[in-house]
Amino acid sequence: SLSGGVIPINGGIIIDLSRMNRILEVSIENRYARVQAGVVCDDLNRVLAKRGFVFPPDPASSTVSTIGGNVATNAGGIKGARYGTTRDYVLGLQVVLPTGEVMHTGSYTMKCVSGYDLAKLFIGAEGTLGIITEVTLKINPLPRHAMTAVATYGKLEDAGKAIFQTMTSGVIP
């Protein structure tokens, strides 16, 4: 973890899920992927790219970060302003609760209006409420074009104004 999330403090424990690294299902028709928690973000995106799709959140550690870790920390990345964070892509979870019970949350659909969205409770909780073992994610079509722009400013205030003007102009970076 580049964020230090796996450093145990005050007698904490670490559970290594790296061998739970299978992509269980990709449904292009329904625009979701179901994966085990140990799947590395970039590995998932390589598989999805072959089919013209992507999982947009891109933490700086995407070469080593796992989907389960991304969910546990609600990882985002540089594309967050445009695409959102991991929370915006979680359709459902399988979680092992502290009691040992296995809980399933969410659905395989883009919109589920029945009951509470318990997945949101676990997203960003950093494993304190349960161990995420499986994740169902929304996937997006790959963008047709991508570009990177870099700008420098003499004053911090000018950079802030440029960001504000860009965001309020309707352009979503």
Write out the residue ranges for each language-model feature:
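FAD-binding subdomain of flavoenzyme oxidoreductases
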Residues: 22-26, 32-173
